[in-house]
């Protein structure tokens, strides 16, 4: 499975500490094994899945889309304003 990253995901990932990166890497491995592990969103975000995981006591959300060939990592962040920012992503505009 080919893994693609959006520019926003890359820049957020780059700013993480090592322990946070390891948790994100583990979450990505879980998603690769079972892409439907995340919760599929509804309405205007219907093609997006969000996987929730904890780093220490902080809840992180990882938004992604997938098809049989590609897994696209869209956005990573904490819950605060996550969905608002996700809706504004140019990647999801049609």
Where are these regions (language model features)?
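Residue-level detector of beta-strand structural context in well-folded domains
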Residues: 1, 49-51, 62
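Arg/Lys-rich, positively charged N-terminal/basic patches that mediate binding to nucleic acids
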Residues: 1-27
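Alpha-helix boundary recognition
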Residues: 14, 32-33, 87
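Enriched for short, Lys/Arg-rich terminal
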Residues: 55-61, 65-94
